[in-house]
């Protein structure tokens, strides 16, 4: 997210269960790349920052999409994650998130 917040010239940014908070919020017009945020709905690490992140991106005029996966916590896309309750692999959420990332890249890069 910090790369996107910096205004870097990249085609798009995807994050799986990434941190959303920052000490340097994006300024209006700075975020150039579309964003796809894939998050576990039960992720206690990101939950406190979601509303602030959404407001920040709206205020910045960013093109963003935030997806919460039910029943998923932090680390949901890492097959080796097995540290309940906060970091656990979720096969269904991981498959859906990877499919969404593929669609996002298809939109950006084409065939």
What are the language-model segments listed below?
Residues 58-111:
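C-terminal catalytic histidine-bearing segment of alpha/beta-hydrolase fold enzymes
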Residues 30-34, 83-86:
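Short, hinge-like loop/turn segments at secondary-structure boundaries
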Residues 31, 36-39, 69:
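Short beta-strand/loop motif that positions the catalytic acidic residue
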Residues 2, 25-26, 48, 78-80:
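Short, well-ordered secondary-structure micro-motifs
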Residues 17, 40-41:
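N-terminal Rossmann-fold cofactor-binding loop
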Residues 1-32:
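Primarily recognizes the serine-hydrolase "nucleophile elbow" in alpha/beta-hydrolase
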Residues 44-52:
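Conserved alpha/beta-hydrolase "acid-adjacent" motif
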Residues 41-44, 72-73:
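Acidic beta-to-alpha connecting loop that harbors the catalytic carboxylate
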